[in-house]
């Protein structure tokens, strides 16, 4: 933990968990969608569900989905901005068994019809943890540049990606792998120390067995 974790982020109030963290959750979901969002369905669990209106969590999540930062004054008028942008957003208080108290399950649809589902929690001080992407278990914070790579589970798939990153001077800080079943769809998650260029990301996308690459800028 560093001093900024204790002090908390620069943000529009009232709470780092309910505002700054919620904005970041929306930002990450938008990055994973990869295009302008036209509709959002958000399931809120725990304290998010019970206090989201009073603490402005709805405005914060909505702002993140629209690409605003946690210190953007427009968070206060997020609903007006969403109407201007013709973004349809629905919040549903509920319960996600076993989830952190400040958890949201965010389902987005983009302008081309692409969809994504992201489940994550605001864990305090403006920090977040993403637990699921489209139903697959992951664990990343968004504090580092992050690569999510969907691929066919096959020998050599991981090595092909990590070798290409190493050849281009990209150091991996953390790595995890989730697969639905042996030989099926899998997801590599890598937090990296420096940002891979677009050309490198395209080279990874062209590797055998790669289905999708999502880059989340810190």
Q: What is each of the regions a protein language model found here?
A:
Residues 66-116:
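Contiguous domain-boundary segments centered on the initiation and propagation of an alpha-helix
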